[in-house]
């Protein structure tokens, strides 16, 4: 019988139970025991769901209260000194302090840096290491969760982040080489593997996703060294797991490593199948990632079955496992909850639970079970209906794309001329202050939105409520002394969803939540067809906010690349083409904002770097169409209109030329968690336009001191001319409270005033 396995399951719960449990605990409403009870219930539910879906070997230790990379650092005692006292006194509080920071009980701790998990929209906490790092086992989470499942009668395969990937995903605070710590780390892995074997684990999934990256000779040698040592001690069988792309030139390396099985991504790396089959060592299991773990479209089961049969013919039925391409962390839990979704589109989709069923169908078809044919036929019909649907293809969009010319992507004049025109119009002081866009979405705001959507609040009453919140926001910014204001975005539930709801070609789920980080969940739109803007989307609220103040008001848009990256994107055409469609829709919106008297327009692109292909050789093509799309959206304005963009969680050193090519008048970037490290890019590259390096971290509730911000601004001033510098937070303030927001922004304005006075 063909084995069905899974690499990871969504943690948050079908109805975001984990989010609610975490936030209740952080507010002090529940204790650690209650939080852990919810966690155990979720794990049990998910293991049973996978078992009932026909998964023969589900994972364990894929669950986390916040982040699996943080879990790994915590497990191996890679805890920075500043957290030691709290961790020793209260491990769970210390764990959350590492994730979120802590400012209470005379404790003032920064959180660990956060960054994107490869090219996904999931964020992980970056472990901090140093040359004298000591590793030791702290707790027994992987063993405890394996035994927890076993007590339910379910045998699982524990998941570990592999030692080399763990080090490569970390940072050293003293500039030392991360891989030099391998010899210190491996004994702890060896100890853990031995304990897992003693607990009865037959297999361990050891994730080394960095195997799909460009690796230098030193890193390749680190892999060889690591697995040679892990192979010496008693251990369970190891499933070496790669995902997010083909192994490419690391295939030979992966096959040299002494593992008992190899998982490959056959969705993003279809082309690697022949090479793997021709070189897979005798006796080694092949886990074939045939179902897309990152997107929500139904699998072409005929195509997947063809690959599976081909693989089975080479390795034999007993050595072939069927799996998703990667962990299902990146997709919603269950499509069955979406009762009100357009029936046609719904029939084209598969969420985590349905993807497991697809794998079972493939396994049954491989085993020649007749019941598989019904599901195969249903899938064929759904895919054909999608190909033929008029909901997907619009001739007017194709015509507009064909009419694009180089002039579509150019401003009227170069930045030096535009900046003079803008300063004449806006009359801003040195070190102008602004925010990134959103202001706190309080419980009252969320409740009013929910009441409006459920019909309990009339449209006129809801609009009156939003106007009052917007005016409060504008008055608060004026009182604080900010120079360029925003309207607060109280009408918006999400920076992508808000726009997608107003664009043809997008559709939204009700419960299609996925984890972004910690308790932060997002509900990505689904781009199922050609994108068109039927009517203005933001003009009414921006114009209203501008009518309340004489100060410049920023129009706030989400950029085309970010809308693409943060959506589930159609897989029947190139991503670049979909991005250009979104850009044209935004171009129309930008023009309407300018006509309405909005002189500053921000087009956020926080996701531009995460769209980079994992292999550097593929970067140029992506950056070309990403930059082109931004310029399509932003170039149809007068010189006096100032175009801003915002980017967060980004490293710019290697894409600084592309960032400059966007030709935004002002960019704001996330820099505070990295203590302005991102500005290193500007030492070698003379960035031509204005820039606002974020001076405080909005992902943490702590209010920074004025001196901290002044120091960061002085660091920025050492790299950039003062006339190019803006002063702003790292990101939007949606998730913060009003009290801390007001205090932090007041401190920020005072910091800017100090620099002006020097």
From Swiss-Prot:
Zn(2+) binds at residues 646, 648, 670, 731. GO terms for biological process: methionine biosynthetic process; methylation. It catalyses: 5-methyltetrahydropteroyltri-L-glutamate + L-homocysteine = tetrahydropteroyltri-L-glutamate + L-methionine. Its cofactor is Zn(2+). Binds 1 zinc ion per subunit. The keyword Chaperone does not apply. 5-methyltetrahydropteroyltri-L-glutamate binds at residues 16-19, 116, 520-521, 566, 610. It is an enzyme of class 2 (transferase). The active site is at residue 699. GO terms for molecular function: 5-methyltetrahydropteroyltriglutamate-homocysteine S-methyltransferase activity; zinc ion binding. Pathway: Amino-acid biosynthesis; L-methionine biosynthesis via de novo pathway; L-methionine from L-homocysteine (MetE route): step 1/1. L-homocysteine binds at residues 436-438, 489, 604. Keywords: Amino-acid biosynthesis, Metal-binding, Methionine biosynthesis, Methyltransferase, Repeat, Transferase, Zinc. The keyword Transport does not apply. It holds the Pfam family Meth_synt_1. L-methionine binds at residues 436-438, 489, 604. Its EC number is 2.1.1.14. InterPro entries: Cbl-indep_Met_Synth_N, Cobalamin-indep_Met_synthase, Met_Synth_C/arc, UROD/MetE-like_sf. Belongs to the vitamin-B12 independent methionine synthase family. Catalyzes the transfer of a methyl group from 5-methyltetrahydrofolate to homocysteine resulting in methionine formation. This is 5-methyltetrahydropteroyltriglutamate--homocysteine methyltransferase. It comes from Xylella fastidiosa (strain Temecula1 / ATCC 700964). The gene is metE.
